[in-house]
Each structure stands twice: as C-alpha cells, then as structure tokens.
Amino acid sequence: MKRIAFVFSTVPHGTAAGREGLDALLATSALTDELAVFFIADGVFQLLPGQKPDAVLARDYIATFKLLGLYDIEQCWVCAASLRERGLDPQTPFVVEATPLEADALRRELANYDVILRF
C-alpha cells in the first residue's frame, strides 16, 4: 500500500481547502493506515482551538481534527519555522498533538511518502 501524506498549508476559513482536506483524510484512513498529516505555512492555523468561523459565516470543522486519534492517525507534524513566523509557540495547546519539526527535517519526513495531497 502506498504511503500518503496530507499537507495543510492554507488558513482554515475563507476557503474550503482545509475542510475538504480533513474530509479526504478521514475517508482515506478507512483504506490505509500509512498516513501522515503535515501542517505548514498558514496551515498551522488549522491547529488552533477557539476559532470563531461563524463570524465569517463558515462551518466550524476545526474540532473534527480531534477525531484523528480515533481514526488511528497518529503521525502529525507541524513546521516549527512556520509557527515562529506566525508568532505561535510550539507549546501552544493545539487541537491535535503535532510534533514540531524544523523545515529540513520536515522535508526529509515528507520524502518518505509516495503520495502527497496538499490542501
């Protein structure tokens, strides 16, 4: 079975990319257990709790990330440089447990996957 990486690189609200990526991730988890999730660039904002999407008439799907553990999706990585660039601390309580990696280590980890889907 191919190893599949899901890369979240966009802000959570304003586009449907994050929600669609999460839906695809959960659906794919029924087919394979060789999955990993990467949060890079503005995608790190997907990890923040307490968002108010109703203010922009968007659906609140961020809490659904908490289901990753129930779907046995345990490989979650977040770009440490992206966190710093956006003024976020790696110690921030995120909605999922994601391991911070520097950009070069993150690229090496991502290279281990056969298919990369970006949202």
Curated annotation (Swiss-Prot):
What does the record list as GO biological process?
tRNA processing
Q: Which domain of life is it from?
A: Bacteria
Matches recorded under Pfam families: DsrE (PF02635)
A single GO CC term for this protein reads: cytoplasm
Cell compartments where the protein resides: Cytoplasm
| Record SUPFAM superfamilies | DsrEFH-like
Q: Does the keyword tRNA processing apply?
A: yes
- Please classify the protein's predominant subcellular localization into one broad category: cytoplasm
* Keywords, comma-separated and alphabetical: Cytoplasm, tRNA processing
Q: Which residues form the signal peptide?
A: none
Q: How does it assemble?
A: Heterohexamer, formed by a dimer of trimers. The hexameric TusBCD complex contains 2 copies each of TusB, TusC and TusD. The TusBCD complex interacts with TusE.
Which family is this protein grouped under? Belongs to the DsrF/TusC family.
In UniProt terms, what function does this protein have?
Part of a sulfur-relay system required for 2-thiolation of 5-methylaminomethyl-2-thiouridine (mnm(5)s(2)U) at tRNA wobble positions.
Q: What is this protein called?
A: Protein TusC
Chain's gene name = tusC
